């Protein structure tokens, strides 16, 4: 019995030693892997984010471009969607690549950021369509009016953003004048678009006190719109126009600021 007890104790001791050794080896292995990962990460950071190994990087990248180009990954087509007012040559100039250039050499983020420098472009999406096409989707700003401020004229979009000083191609748009007119022009234009005949006869919309609008119509007719709910006043003016009671009544001014009582002045 005593010999068996001693034998069992020896076996337990050996098992304990084996487990302890395996644990130590396991910990050493984990530490070695961790150190290897850290070294590898440092090497990658040095390779990518520093000037070390510049010649090696250049050599590798150049060879990758050459190989992929031979495999057909080269620029052959450029698809542009959403382009209306931005000059196509300007877009291609920003692309800055010749036909058959390595398609992977194109820096898409840089192209996108450079395109956004155009005041016409609100948003842009650039992607590769492998193996040989670059796709450019433009979201241009849509001009809604011509804004006059400090004796200068600007083409503006629905947000009041100044797109361009070249207003000639858009001379048919509503002319808005005054401080803040660019910000509030969108709502006025949207309402006037409900009455095309009235919009067509509106020459200028003047922002008064940054609170309300005065409209100057053809025939030297001036209309003072209310500060609030000017939509009702526009509906009234359109009704007068449709019944031929606006432009052939010798009207000089219509004061519609008081919704309960309208004032009409004749020449």
Swiss-Prot record:
Gene Ontology CC annotations of this record: cell division site; plasma membrane
Transmembrane annotation, as ranges: 33-53
Topology feature Periplasmic, residues: 54-267
Protein name, per record: Cell division protein FtsQ
Family of the protein in this entry: Belongs to the FtsQ/DivIB family. FtsQ subfamily.
Compartments where found: Cell inner membrane
GO biological process terms held by the UniProt record: cell septum assembly; FtsZ-dependent cytokinesis
Topological type in the membrane: Single-pass type II membrane protein
Function: Essential cell division protein.
One Pfam family here: POTRA_1
Organism of provenance: Rickettsia prowazekii (strain Madrid E)
Gene3D superfamilies registered for this protein in UniProt: membrane protein fhac (3.10.20.310)
Keyword terms, alphabetized: Cell cycle, Cell division, Cell inner membrane, Cell membrane, Membrane, Transmembrane, Transmembrane helix
UniProt xrefs under PROSITE patterns: POTRA
Matching InterPro entries: Cell_div_FtsQ/DivIB_C, FtsQ, POTRA, POTRA_FtsQ_type
Domain POTRA: residue ranges: 73-141
Cytoplasmic topological segments: 1-32
Primary localisation category: membrane
């Amino acid at each position: 019995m005593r010999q068996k007890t001693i034998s069992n104790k020896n076996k337990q001791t050996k098992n304990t030693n084996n487990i302890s050794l395996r644990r130590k080896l396991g910990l050493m292995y984990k530490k070695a892997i961790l150190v290897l990962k850290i070294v590898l990460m440092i090497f990658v950071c040095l390779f990518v984010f520093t000037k070390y190994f510049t010649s090696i990087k250049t050599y590798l990248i150049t060879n990758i471009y050459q190989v992929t180009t031979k495999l057909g990954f080269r620029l052959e087509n450029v698809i542009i969607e959403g382009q209306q007012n931005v000059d196509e040559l300007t877009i291609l100039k920003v692309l800055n690549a010749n036909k058959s250039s390595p398609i992977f050499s194109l820096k898409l983020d840089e192209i996108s950021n450079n395109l956004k420098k155009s005041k016409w472009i609100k948003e842009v999406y650039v992607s590769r369509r492998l193996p040989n096409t670059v796709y450019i989707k433009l979201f241009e700003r849509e001009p809604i009016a011509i804004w006059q401020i400090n004796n200068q004229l600007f083409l503006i979009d629905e947000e009041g953003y100044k797109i361009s000083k070249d207003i000639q191609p858009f001379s048919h748009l509503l002319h808005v004048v005054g401080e803040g007119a660019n910000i509030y022009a969108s709502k006025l234009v949207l309402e006037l678009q409900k009455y095309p005949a009235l919009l067509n006869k509106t020459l200028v919309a003047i922002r008064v006190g940054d609170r309300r609008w005065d409209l100057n119509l053809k025939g030297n007719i001036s209309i003072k719109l209310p500060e609030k709910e000017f939509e009702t006043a526009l509906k009234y003016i359109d009704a007068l126009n449709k019944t031929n009671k606006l432009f052939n009544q010798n009207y000089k001014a219509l004061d519609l600021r008081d919704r309960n009582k309208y004032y009409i002045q004749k020449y």
